[in-house]
Amino acid sequence: AFSKAIELMERVGIPQPEIRAKQLPYELSGGMCQRAMIASALVSKPKLLIADEPTTALDVTVQAQILQLLSELSSELGLSVLLITHDMGVVAEIADDVSVMYGGRIVERGSVENIFALPHHPYTQMLLQTLPRVDRPRKEELFTISGSVPSPGDQRRGCRFFPRCDRAVDDCKERPVLLPGVDGAACFSPL
């Protein structure tokens, strides 16, 4: 088991894996801890790797290395990666297909290209508008989405984004909205 751990630690780019394997987490950098977590996830040779916020609290250089590692592992091992993140830059960098969630529900699904170029759900559009962009004037204020996120206990029947949406209609408040097929938006008034 130890030799397999060393092999996987080496594969994910941890230097001196024989030494690092005996260290405690606080003795490792954030990037090494993330690599160790990825190595431990690969022990059982999964077909799917669920990566929940894999780049949070990492500097930009280490973040790029972790994304590159996930991409390489996906190709080499035939591994699907389910990436859970709030970082739309990470989504743009690594994802093929995207599911946008709001309040615990999927509100839009599509290819990364379609989601970024032509969002159909008002939340997706507003989410993308909040991203800082280099082509905007420096003094321009960042876009914010008005209102509050629903509490986890709020189990409204309709769209959870309804109170914050400028395109909402009566049906949005009362009726559950289903995603149409594989791609599309769960919205009565899509863009």
Spans of features found by a protein language model:
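P-loop NTP-binding/switch modules centered on Walker-like glycine-rich loops
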Residues: 50-54, 58-140
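ABC nucleotide-binding domain "signature" region
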Residues: 1-12, 127-130
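Short catalytic/signature loops enriched in Gly
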Residues: 15-19, 109-191
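Conserved helix-loop functional segments at active or binding sites
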Residues: 10-15, 72, 76
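A short, proline-enriched helix->beta-strand linker immediately N-terminal to the Walker B motif
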Residues: 43-47
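Conserved ABC ATPase signature
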Residues: 23-28, 32
